[in-house]
A protein has these predicted regions:
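Bacterial N-terminal signal peptides that target proteins for export
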Residues: 1-10
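C-terminal motif of bacterial Sec signal peptides marking the signal peptidase cleavage site
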Residues: 16-19
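Surface-exposed short loop/turn segments
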Residues: 21-39, 43-44, 109-161
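A structural "domain/chain start" motif
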Residues: 21-95, 207-221
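Envelope-exposed proteins and targeting segments
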Residues: 53-55, 69-71, 78, 86, ...
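Solvent-exposed coil/turn segments that connect beta secondary-structure elements
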Residues: 62-64, 78-80, 133-135, 154-160, ...
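Short secondary-structure boundary motifs at beta->alpha junctions and helix caps
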Residues: 81-89, 161-202
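Sec-exported extracytoplasmic/periplasmic mature domains
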Residues: 103-111, 201-209
Length: 221
């Protein structure tokens, strides 16, 4: 009996390893991963208006609109149908991607003493909350033409101490893809995101420029 068991053991081990190998094999196509870059934006201030530049700003983790909380690249079809590009994804989930882009854009503007991400341990003067309303390629016209990419943010800016709201504003951008190819669609996402982020940066800076002198006047009274 022991003799037969010793003969069967290598056979069973081989079958087990073959089974593991079959589970590890996948016929699914590889996922193409895409990312976007933050471009430098012009300063929104003037040489005699240093008030906002003396301030620090924290970018809170963005809130995601329905269907926008994953790393999938979203497209909209006719009849209000939401879908995703197969075999492709952003390098991070959409809120994390937007947070990174917003922080880099604000930092590159030179309008702030420091820009902190949501998880930074350092305190900040102001807090920016972004809600991602749109981040999609829109095919809803149903004409077969290349999609129009829409990027839209709803933003709330407030003082971090006391959470007093200073301003609420929208920032958006759109761009038509050059062709019905994913590379062209991603390029349109880049252009639309650049527009939205530039608007966000300039409006946030303007809001703090307005708020800081007003707060100083109120304390002086």
């Amino acid at each position: 009996m022991w003799k037969y068991s010793r003969r069967l053991a290598p056979m069973l081990l081989g079958l087990g390893m073959a089974g593991c190998a079959s589970y590890l094999h996948s016929d699914a196509p590889p996922v193409q991963v895409y990312t976007l870059r933050a471009d430098a934006v012009p300063s929104g201030g003037t040489a005699d208006a240093p008030s906002a530049r003396a301030a620090s700003l924290r970018v809170a983790h963005p809130l995601a609109g329905p269907g926008l909380g994953t790393s999938e690249i979203v497209l909209l079809q006719p009849d209000h149908r939401m879908d995703f590009y197969a075999g492709s994804a952003w390098a991070a989930d959409t809120p994390a991607l937007v947070e990174s882009l917003a922080a880099k854009t604000l930092r590159a503007s030179g309008n702030w003493s420091s820009i902190e991400n949501a998880d930074s341990p350092f305190p900040s003067d102001y807090l920016l909350q972004i809600a991602v309303r749109r981040f999609d390629a829109d095919y809803s016209a149903g004409t077969g033409a290349p999609p129009t990419v829409h990027v839209a943010f709803d933003c709330t800016l407030g003082s971090e101490a006391g959470r007093r709201i200073l301003a609420s504003f929208a920032a958006s951008g759109s761009a038509v893809a050059g062709a019905n190819k994913l590379g062209e669609v991603v390029a349109a996402f880049q252009r639309a995101a650049d527009q939205a982020l530039t608007s966000l940066s300039q409006q946030a800076f303007a809001a703090v420029q307005t708020a800081r002198p007003a707060a100083a006047d109120a304390r002086a009274r």
